């Protein structure tokens, strides 16, 4: 078992934390806004660990669902499950185990948060199969990656206000943007194996679609900033996020694999500066 542990870590992408961070930033945004900038540390621990565990469970489930496709894709052919280094039942067991531990984390929280966690589990578990028939599975991914937002509001306020759902919509558009960049890397392979992705659905308008999704995301955060009366610190973070989006355009405009992958990874900075703006606003407002 110990000899297989490094393979299990690779299965759940512990060597690639970018996915966990893309889940974490919007969840932290929600925790800070829901608590007026003073989130309780137990909630920070629960949601941070839950984000890591559920993303890891999702990776294991995704590799199980895509095991017959991934062997035909250059980037994924050497994944532990695809290459036969671990078995399918092991991936399922790991996914179920991690999801169960995630549920144990939220047991101290209120009933509404637990109810929302059931929905979140269903969305996360069903996402890997969306690529079979949904033309833009990245939108469904945005729901899965963003469901920590309504859960955070529920945990803090015992209700899910309108702003939480608006933030979730922003996260859906952001997810379509960065995961389309990711899909642009595998475009040729995905055409051969018949998988549906937003990069293929958007076709020659893929770059325009990515930038439009960034515009909608950042436009929604303008509404959030104005509605909540955020100050200059927030707008500095927002402006930095705009700069990130414009930088991504320079990377993806020629549709080359490695620059598109670099743009995807750089979304960690976009999410990070948005959160930094929110946190800085509350920090300065309370000083």
Curated annotation (Swiss-Prot):
Pathway noted in the entry: Cofactor biosynthesis; ubiquinone biosynthesis
PROSITE patterns: UBIA (PS00943)
Pfam families to which the protein is assigned, alphabetical: UbiA (PF01040)
Transmembrane segments: 41-61, 89-109, 133-153, 158-178, 202-224, 267-287
E.C. number(s) listed in UniProt: 2.5.1.39
Catalysis: reaction(s): all-trans-octaprenyl diphosphate + 4-hydroxybenzoate = 4-hydroxy-3-(all-trans-octaprenyl)benzoate + diphosphate
Cellular compartments annotated: Cell inner membrane
One example GO MF annotation: 4-hydroxybenzoate polyprenyltransferase activity
Any one biological process term the GO annotation gives: ubiquinone biosynthetic process
Domain of life where this protein originates: Bacteria
Entry GO terms, CC: plasma membrane
Membrane topology classification: Multi-pass membrane protein
Function, as annotated: Catalyzes the prenylation of para-hydroxybenzoate (PHB) with an all-trans polyprenyl group. Mediates the second step in the final reaction sequence of ubiquinone-8 (UQ-8) biosynthesis, which is the condensation of the polyisoprenoid side chain with PHB, generating the first membrane-bound Q intermediate 3-octaprenyl-4-hydroxybenzoate.
The family this protein is said to belong to: Belongs to the UbiA prenyltransferase family.
Stated name of the protein: 4-hydroxybenzoate octaprenyltransferase
């Amino acid at each position: 078992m110990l000899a297989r542990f490094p393979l299990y870590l690779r299965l759940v992408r512990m060597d690639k934390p970018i996915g966990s961070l893309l889940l974490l930033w919007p969840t932290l945004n929600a925790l800070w806004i829901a608590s007026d900038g003073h989130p309780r540390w137990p909630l920070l621990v629960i949601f941070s660990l839950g984000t890591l565990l559920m993303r890891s469970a999702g990776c294991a489930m995704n590799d199980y669902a895509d095991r017959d496709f991934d062997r035909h894709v250059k980037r994924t052919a050497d994944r532990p499950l695809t290459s036969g280094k671990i078995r399918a039942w092991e991936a399922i067991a790991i996914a179920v185990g991690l999801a169960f531990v995630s549920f144990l984390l939220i047991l101290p929280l209120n009933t509404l948060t637990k109810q929302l966690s059931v929905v979140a589990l269903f969305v996360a578990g069903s996402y890997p199969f969306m690529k079979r028939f949904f033309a833009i599975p990245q939108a469904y991914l945005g729901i899965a990656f963003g469901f920590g937002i309504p859960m955070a509001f529920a945990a803090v306020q015992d209700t899910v206000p309108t702003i939480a759902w608006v933030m979730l919509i922003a996260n859906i558009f952001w997810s379509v943007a960065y995961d389309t960049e990711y899909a642009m890397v595998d475009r040729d392979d995905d055409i051969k194996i018949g998988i549906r992705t937003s990069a293929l659905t958007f076709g020659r308008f893929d770059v325009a679609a990515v930038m439009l999704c960034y515009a909608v995301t950042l436009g929604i955060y303008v509404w959030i900033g104005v509605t909540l009366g955020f100050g200059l610190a927030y707008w500095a973070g927002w402006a930095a996020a705009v700069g990130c989006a414009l930088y991504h355009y320079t990377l993806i405009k020629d549709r080359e694999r490695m620059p598109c992958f670099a743009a995807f990874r750089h979304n960690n900075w976009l999410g990070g500066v948005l959160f930094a703006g929110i946190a800085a606003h509350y920090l300065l407002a309370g000083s």
